[in-house]
Amino acid sequence: MRMKDLYAPTLKETPSDVETVSHEYLLRGGFIRKTAAGIYTYLPLGRRVLLKIENIVREEMNRIGAQEILMPILQPAELWKQSGRWDDYGPEMMKLKDRHERDFTLGPTHEEIVTDLVKNELRSYRQLPLVVYQVANKYRDEIRPRFGLLRAREFIMKDAYSFHSSWESLDETYELFKEAYSRIMERLGVKYMVIEAETGAIGGNASHEFVVPAKIGETNVLFCEKCGYQASDEKAEYKGEYTQEQEEEKPFKKVPTPGVKTIEEVSEFLGVPPSKIVKSLLYKGREGYVMVLIRGDLELNEAKLKAHLKDQSLRMATPEEILKDFGVPVGFIGPIGVDVKKVADHSVRGLKNFVVGGMEEDTHYVNANHPRDFKVDEWYDLRTMVEGDPCPVCGEPLKATKGIELGHIFKLGTKYSEAMKAYFMDENGEMKPFIMGCYGWGVSRTMAAVVEHFHDENGMIWPLSIAPYTVVVDILNMNDAEQKQVGEKIYQVLSEKGEEVVLDDREVSPGFKFKDADLIGFPIRINVGRSLKEGVVELKKRYSKELVKVNIKNGFGTLLETLEKMKREYDPKEAAR
């Protein structure tokens, strides 16, 4: 490919709405263009990277016996209603109606479609296990698309699904996917973590995420340096000590707290620590309102709440709903005298004489006590774990980091097969629901995550495995006939040997060519410039300042050997050392 023909419109300036390095460089490098919020067009360079990522993923899927299919993006609501997720999935689901007023969704995932497919095709345990996968677009109506490809409304995913006659068979396939995903990460060359994760709206009883550490990552990871425990903060369980206060219970009383709503304001106004205040949060779900109680110095973990109550439709009630149904502004909600289901974090159980909302504007109760003053229906671990909390395995203080989720695998069990009446006949002639697993990999997100991982102040540093092109040949003076001739010859020789090479034959300055080469991130650059008078060309790795001089007076043999050696030694991680 000649640079003058390559559709790669680079930008000198950073677009104003850019928030991350990957978003900036992919836009400036001419890999993507924004169509609308969270929706992107992939230009030729970006498409080449995507295809290479897809190829790696496909090879690893095929290696473990998965078979590729392609399912429809447009999905009928009936299937989602069968599974119970039409209402549970939440506002991220893009819903639409056809001209006959029938409901559809642009698929955020494909559990329903694939379960419906298989239940009409597989009848016997002899046909199991079956593993299928696809690489396709997915759609989620993100409330705030951000970070470029990392949180988009349209994105490319590989999603795989497995069907089994036994839990042992599912366990075996689950481990195969763990190994396959680890190999994908290793082929990308990135550091990664495999962490325990919450199943969320997908469901199931076990889940792991494959995460690339990154400061801008949206997955909060807790890990133990002693025993190796790793989990998302949504999943990590608190197994430490709880406060068990021994003081005598005092009579509760209502006190005026004018304009005092937040935990911090209440703490300062009443002169009590946040740990002596109980937050009362109202949620709405399938069964109506639920009041959630947690100690004031802790954060509620919504993922745990939804998992414990088995209701993914749960959401925090709006101030308008609370005012309409309870007659109280947000900030003064409390558990005393309120006839709704109450669930509480274990941190509340051992408290004495604490503060709660007074269920009346500008009012709180002090010296509230459980169970004297109100009843809790169910107790759970509902806190969000943070750095310094004890490891649930060995008790050592946990460390925290952030990461970008690329892969997520689930043991679904019979969640979908039972709901959608998908059965097979076992070896005893009995009808049993399929035992299922599902396995997602963010293909377009991988491109951004790799850039976040490998870059410098000049641009992207692609690993060889997914670089759009391996080599760029820069003719530094297009007015020099010898440079043009030699540059063209090197380009021709490399192309004939199957090398993915770009010839920069533009009528621009050497500095301009170097900046574009660094921004785009070509792994290896060959300079054909003034040193050609001595019969020398220069080779340079993207992340290195060293120029390797190669004499080509007697042909290109040494050049080709040097290039192969540089490719063998090429390691983007060197840039961080």
From Swiss-Prot:
GO terms for cellular component: cytosol. It is found in: Cytoplasm. Keywords: Aminoacyl-tRNA synthetase, ATP-binding, Cytoplasm, Ligase, Nucleotide-binding, Protein biosynthesis. One of its GO terms (biological process) is prolyl-tRNA aminoacylation. Its EC number is 6.1.1.15. It comes from the Bacteria. It catalyses: tRNA(Pro) + L-proline + ATP = L-prolyl-tRNA(Pro) + AMP + diphosphate. The keyword ATP-binding applies. Its main location: cytoplasm. Coiled coil: none annotated. Consists of three domains: the N-terminal catalytic domain, the editing domain and the C-terminal anticodon-binding domain. PANTHER family: MITOCHONDRIAL RIBOSOME PROTEIN L39/PROLYL-TRNA LIGASE FAMILY MEMBER, PROLINE--TRNA LIGASE. Belongs to the class-II aminoacyl-tRNA synthetase family. ProS type 1 subfamily. Catalyzes the attachment of proline to tRNA(Pro) in a two-step reaction: proline is first activated by ATP to form Pro-AMP and then transferred to the acceptor end of tRNA(Pro). As ProRS can inadvertently accommodate and process non-cognate amino acids such as alanine and cysteine, to avoid such errors it has two additional distinct editing activities against alanine. One activity is designated as 'pretransfer' editing and involves the tRNA(Pro)-independent hydrolysis of activated Ala-AMP. This is Proline--tRNA ligase.
